[in-house]
Amino acid sequence: MDTNKSVIYSQFFSKLINDNNEMDDTMTSFLYYLFPRELFIRALSLLDSGDMFIYVLENGNISSSSMNLVPTVCDSDESRSPSSSGNSNNEASNESNTIDSNSIVEELYDIDTELQNRLIVKTHEKDSPPIYVDLKTWFCSCDEFNSYFNLELQKNQSIPIQDTLIRNIDDIQEFSEDKFAQIDAHSLSKQKYVCHEKLMCPHLLAYSILLASSTKTLRYFTLVNQTVLLIRISNMDEWLKLHINIVS
C-alpha cells in the first residue's frame, strides 16, 4: 500500500457500491489488489457477517422509543427472529427503524455533525470480549492491532511513536481530500494521517469502508444488505455503560 495521499482511498470506497445498489465487481477487484489481499477479504467478510454494530451517541435529546427500535449486541439474534404475533406492530417498527437509520446515515456524513460513533464487533471465540473500534483515534482493541503497534514500538525505541506512525501535512497546498486513516480531521492548519500500512486490522478497514467513503456505501450495508446494525444511544450514561462493558 502506498502512503502517498495522492491516492484518495475514500473515493475508491465510495465507488464500491454502484448505482444499482450492488457491489461493483471492478472496484472490488481494484481494492483487492490495492490492499493486502487477505486483509481486504477479511474486511469484506466482516461487512457481510452481521457481527458489526455501530453505536451512535447524539448530543441532543432523543425519545426513548426511538432507541428501542434497534437491537443491542446482546439481543440482536432474538430481535431478528419474527414473532408469531404482532406483525403489524413489527412492520410499523421496521418502517420507523428504516427512517431513523436513514437519518443517522445522513448525519454521520454531515461535516458539522456532533454525533459520536464507535464500532463494536461481536466475536465468536469462547470467553472473548467484543472488539471495540474507534476511527477518529485509529484504534482497535483486537490482538492483531495491538501486535502491530507493539512491533512498531520495538522497532523504533529511539524515535517517538507519533513520528513513526503519523504523517503530518503542514502545507495547505498539499492538503488531501482523503478521509481514510485521517485523525484530528477538524484542524484547519494541519492534516494528520496514520501510516495505515504499518497499523491496520480488518476491523479498521471495514469501518473505514463504511464511514470514510459515502452515504451510498454506508446505506448499502446498513439498510439494503442489512448486515451492519446502527444503534442510536440517547444519553451519556448508556454510552459510558457501553464502554465499561467492553473493558470488563
Curated annotation (Swiss-Prot):
Residues 73-99 are annotated as: Disordered. Belongs to the SHU2 family. GO terms for biological process: DNA recombinase assembly; maintenance of rDNA. One of its GO terms (cellular component) is nucleus. Keywords: DNA damage, DNA recombination, DNA repair, Nucleus. The lineage of its organism: Eukaryota, Fungi, Dikarya, Ascomycota, Saccharomycotina. This is Suppressor of hydroxyurea sensitivity protein 2. Residues 81-97 have a biased composition (Low complexity). Plays a role in a RAD51/RAD54-dependent homologous recombination repair (HRR) pathway to repair MMS-induced lesions during S-phase. Required for error-free repair of spontaneous and induced DNA lesions to protect the genome from mutation. It comes from Vanderwaltozyma polyspora (strain ATCC 22028 / DSM 70294 / BCRC 21397 / CBS 2163 / NBRC 10782 / NRRL Y-8283 / UCD 57-17) (Kluyveromyces polysporus). It is found in: Nucleus. It comes from the Eukaryota.
